[in-house]
């Protein structure tokens, strides 16, 4: 039997007191109190299976791993891969029954779903407590017309409402490799999300096809854990905005956020309507009542996205001549992962995709938050140009609920990339 400090004290107390082993009651009481404090602290610090990384991967916990896909819509234990070929005529129950007709049940009968125009499909409906730890999906069709929404703890207004392409950094509707800690996009359209998303009571994830023509084919997997959630855990939020054109030249990434939380990052899709360098604009964070002047002000757009000097490395070509060109890059926390240079025919516009994740440096707020970025380039003669670009963004943050209601999402005609 393992001897604990409590056992040792019990043995001592049972001994007949003598001059040599008599222990004052005050010392016994203090010893017991110290042990209780240590055991309470240990219980509170018991690993819950969240915040996984290489530094704690060896730690065991009581967390339960579950996963939702079209092969197991509920994520229940022992309920995956049960699609029946006899249900081939029912929508989204045995969609690949024809391909599996020679093999039968258990052989990839329902790996995907189809969502018709105007329909919303519930991808996940989970009872907590727990946390989403990874989402993988590969949506077909026009990504701006597929709207991802997430609801926490039975709320009626979504905490996440974003076109699926923009949520994964693909706002221009075309693939570009994105490799970061929070989001990865791999060939040919494999969207991966690693933002941790804890919830206490319930998690609901939906996808809506707002297009008017084509059905959406979607393969997806939502990996989550059922475990206790810390009392100080905030809820994940993501909100989409677009201005085309940005008539104010002072683009709002987010405003109207109320409560306590922290800003975790942004993805931006910027389409430039003028010649020359377009990224002189400063980002500004208005925190907890700031009005005319912010608490935090950046020094330029490429600076905020952790680059410098127009993202230009000024490389020499094969002839030894210096050439100016944008240099795409991906890092764990920031990147210029997409540059669409135009083809000189119908795709004439320069377009850029950028991300910045504040994973190690979140911008904290206690009451409210507003974030803006200037749409700023150059006139001739060294004068700033207030631009009118096509700008879309997704702001990511965590906060305590309830959250303020989001602005109305634009209709598909205003979302369209053209």
PLM regions with names:
Residues 1-44:
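Bacterial Sec-dependent N-terminal signal peptides
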Residues 44-418:
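Beta-strand-centric surfaces of beta-sandwich/beta-rich domains
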């Amino acid at each position: 039997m393992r001897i604990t400090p409590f056992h040792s004290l019990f043995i001592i107390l049972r001994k007949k007191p003598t001059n040599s082993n008599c222990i004052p009651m005050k010392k016994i009481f203090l010893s017991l109190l110290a042990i209780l404090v240590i055991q309470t602290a240990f219980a509170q610090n018991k690993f819950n299976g969240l915040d996984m990384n290489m530094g704690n991967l060896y730690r065991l916990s009581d967390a339960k791993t579950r996963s939702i896909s079209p092969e197991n819509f509920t994520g229940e234990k022992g309920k995956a891969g049960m699609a029946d070929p006899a249900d081939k005529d029912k929508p989204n129950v045995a969609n690949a029954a024809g391909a599996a007709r020679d093999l039968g049940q258990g052989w990839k009968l329902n790996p995907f779903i189809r969502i018709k125009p105007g329909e919303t499909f519930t991808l996940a409906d989970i009872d907590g407590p727990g946390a989403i730890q990874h989402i993988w999906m590969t949506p077909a069709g026009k990504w701006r017309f597929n709207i991802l929404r997430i609801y926490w703890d039975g709320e009626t207004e979504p905490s996440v409402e974003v076109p699926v392409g923009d949520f994964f950094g693909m706002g221009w509707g075309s693939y570009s490799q994105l490799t970061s800690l929070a989001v990865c996009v791999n060939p040919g359209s494999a969207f991966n999300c690693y933002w941790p998303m804890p919830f206490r009571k319930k998690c609901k994830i939906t996808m809506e096809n707002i297009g008017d023509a084509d059905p959406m084919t979607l393969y997806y997997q939502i990996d989550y854990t059922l475990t206790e959630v810390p009392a100080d855990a905030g809820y994940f939020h993501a909100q989409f905005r677009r201005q085309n054109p940005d008539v104010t030249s002072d683009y709002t990434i987010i405003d109207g956020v109320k409560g306590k939380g922290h800003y975790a990052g942004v993805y931006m899709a910027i389409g430039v309507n003028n010649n020359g360098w377009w990224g002189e604009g400063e980002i500004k964070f208005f925190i907890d009542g700031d009005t005319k002047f912010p608490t935090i002000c950046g020094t330029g757009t490429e600076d905020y996205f952790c680059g410098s000097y127009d993202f230009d490395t000024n490389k020499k070509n094969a002839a030894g001549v210096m050439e100016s060109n944008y240099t795409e890059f991906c890092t764990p926390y920031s990147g210029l992962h997409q540059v669409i240079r135009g083809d000189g025919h119908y795709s004439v516009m320069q377009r850029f995709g950028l991300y910045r994740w504040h994973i190690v440096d979140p911008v904290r707020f206690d009451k409210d938050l507003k974030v803006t970025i200037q749409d700023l380039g150059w006139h001739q003669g060294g004068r700033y140009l207030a631009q009118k670009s096509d700008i879309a963004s997704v702001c990511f943050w965590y906060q305590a609920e309830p959250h303020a209601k989001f602005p109305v999402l634009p209709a598909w005609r205003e979302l369209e990339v053209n």
